[in-house]
């Protein structure tokens, strides 16, 4: 769920102290991402829930109506959009400092794009970078998300992301690299940097 929070820290603290919000919908993990750059509006942040299947995620939608949230919670936020996202490649829940890019990829190139993202992730890790690349397809995302994919480049810290980008821009890019293949198949729509954290775990 994408929201505009009056005070992102206060909002995060409030929902973190109320685990029943996540237990009631069957989340296995939950957290927040606060947008640091590329904001579309003040207080931009993303509240995420992880489920063990799309089935569980869809069932979770039926168990929570944002319009019926406690008054204190409602007063702390304005809801912008919500969606279900399906990961298209292996992705471990390990939030951190994240570059989030929404892209368009032609449907016939989807499998090749996911393979290129996997290749890029493997190449980056082989070069010593602590990075994970997630590719997500939206389900019921409205006009903002329809026809796009969300790509998340996840690293533990701003320093590690910055160092990785410094190294990247000072290196020659092979046309056979995973990055080059991804770029050739995608058209960027939006690009932000988010600071993410996990605030709930079912286990």
Positions of predicted regions on the chain:
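Short S/T/G/P-rich N-terminal loop/turn motif that feeds into the first structured element of a domain
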Residues: 1-203
């Amino acid at each position: 769920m994408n929201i505009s929070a009056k005070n992102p820290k206060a909002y995060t603290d409030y929902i973190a102290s109320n685990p029943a919000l996540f237990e009631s919908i069957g989340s296995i993990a939950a957290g927040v991402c606060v947008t640091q750059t590329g904001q579309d509006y003040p207080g931009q942040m993303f509240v995420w829930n992880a489920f063990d299947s799309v089935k569980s995620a869809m069932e979770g939608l039926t168990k929570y109506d944002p319009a019926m949230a406690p008054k204190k919670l409602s007063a702390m936020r304005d809801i912008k959009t919500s969606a279900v996202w399906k990961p298209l490649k292996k992705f471990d829940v390990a939030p951190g400092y994240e570059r989030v890019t929404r892209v368009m990829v032609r449907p016939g190139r989807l499998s090749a794009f996911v393979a290129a993202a996997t290749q890029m992730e493997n190449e980056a890790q082989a070069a010593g970078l602590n990075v994970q690349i997630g590719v997500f397809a939206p389900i019921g995302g409205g006009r903002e998300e329809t026809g796009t994919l969300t790509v998340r480049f996840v690293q533990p810290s701003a320093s590690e992301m910055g160092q990785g980008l410094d190294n990247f821009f000072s290196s020659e890019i092979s046309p056979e690299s995973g990055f080059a293949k991804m770029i050739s198949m995608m058209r960027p729509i939006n690009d932000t940097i988010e600071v993410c954290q996990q605030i709930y775990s079912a286990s």
